[in-house]
């Protein structure tokens, strides 16, 4: 449990009694991303204390009869738990935009809910995770390793941000800014959608290992922007600029101006990486959007359709997600993994970090 920023402690909770409408998950694995470290460091505010973890895969331990029908799963089934909850009745939920559920909103999500709200088990850094009646639960394909299955979240993001929101079409030239796990997943999603050429950019030694593996995940070109001009590199490779640019960088203010420069006239720029409150965009001129007639879109969260597609793609084996540079640890080593992923330790950050309770 994260009691306060940078204070991750072990805490015992009583397992809840399960009724007709809810369930209990025995956690098999929980993936980590940049959001986890932002919570840990306090950069992303929240209602401390809480159990982090929002990329959970596990086995249904207990389930109510109504919940089993609603989710289509039973005791012993392996499932993935979506980040957001849905009341299934407000206008936003009925339109499929349950990220904006009137009952739950954006903050009332797994891995963010204060532990003072019973039963406290609202995240994947635990042996068990509570499944509320409004949870969104997805069956995991048989034979898919639970550690690999935690990629349902970043790959779902790659599909939604890099294809659905962007409107990526066969033959498109796609530039992905940021070679972290979501960047790799966006590259794979774009290639899977038929993109004709995919470039992925990174920055300096920290991203070196990530850039070395991007070609296994659909990228045709990897560019270290500390060494090479990505606009020049893309022009040399394709004869032009990108139809679609997907910016999944985090805390990289200059990336937005670079994204605008990489987009062709009338192209699309999808911004999914957050910059933090008050961040500027060095080198960016709004006039560039006007003169190039760009379509600039924000992307937040993932939906069930993208999650299901992600699980199917993971199960297909078409991309070597099982071979990603990965570090898997128990609950007692979670803090060290968080520090490593943020570049705050002597160990190089893994592309994919996972906790297995």
Describe the function of each predicted region.
Residues 33, 82-138:
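Cysteine-cluster motifs in flexible loop/terminal segments that predominantly coordinate metals
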Residues 165-170, 199, 208, 212-293, ...:
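Glycine-rich cofactor phosphate-binding loops and adjacent beta1-alpha1 units
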Residues 268, 283-323:
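Rossmann-fold dehydrogenase core element
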Residues 127, 136, 141-227:
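Mid-domain Rossmann-like dinucleotide-binding core that forms the NAD(H)/NADP(H) cofactor-binding site
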Residues 15-30, 43-94, 99, 141-143:
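Glycine-rich beta-strand-centered segment in the early N-terminal region that forms part
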């Amino acid at each position: 449990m994260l009691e306060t920023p940078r204070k991750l402690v072990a805490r015992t909770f009583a397992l809840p009694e399960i009724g007709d409408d809810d369930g209990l998950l025995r956690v098999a694995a929980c993936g980590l991303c940049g959001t986890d470290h932002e919570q840990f460091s306090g950069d992303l505010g929240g209602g401390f204390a809480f159990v982090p973890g929002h990329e959970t895969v596990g086995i249904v331990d207990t389930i109510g009869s109504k919940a089993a029908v609603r989710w289509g799963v039973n005791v012993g089934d392996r499932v993935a738990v979506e980040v957001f909850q849905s009341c299934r009745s407000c206008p936003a939920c009925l339109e499929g935009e349950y990220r904006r559920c009137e009952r739950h909103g954006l903050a009332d999500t797994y891995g963010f809910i204060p532990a003072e709200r019973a039963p406290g088990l609202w995240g994947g850094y635990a042996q068990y995770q509570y499944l509320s009646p409004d949870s969104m639960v997805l069956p995991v394909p048989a034979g898919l390793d639970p550690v690999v299955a935690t990629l349902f979240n970043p790959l779902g993001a790659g599909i939604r941000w890099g294809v659905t929101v962007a409107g990526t079409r066969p033959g498109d030239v796609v530039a992905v800014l940021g070679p972290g796990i979501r960047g790799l997943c966006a590259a794979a999603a774009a290639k899977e959608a038929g993109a004709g050429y995919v470039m992925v950019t990174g920055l300096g030694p920290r991203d070196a290992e990530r850039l070395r593996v991007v070609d296994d995940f659909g990228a045709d070109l990897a560019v270290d922007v500390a060494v090479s001009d990505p606009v020049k590199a893309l022009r040399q490779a394709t004869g032009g600029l990108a139809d679609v640019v997907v910016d999944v960088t985090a805390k990289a203010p200059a990336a937005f101006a670079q994204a605008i420069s990489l987009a062709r006239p009338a192209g699309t720029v999808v911004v999914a990486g957050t910059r933090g409150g008050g961040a500027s965009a060095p080198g960016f001129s709004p006039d560039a959007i006007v003169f190039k007639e760009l379509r600039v879109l924000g992307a937040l969260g993932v939906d069930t359709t993208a999650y299901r597609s992600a699980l199917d793609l993971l199960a297909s084996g078409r991309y070597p997600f099982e071979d990603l540079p990965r570090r898997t640890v128990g609950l007692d080593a979670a803090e060290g993994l968080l520090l490593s992923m943020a570049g705050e330790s002597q160990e190089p950050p893994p592309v994919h970090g996972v906790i297995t309770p």
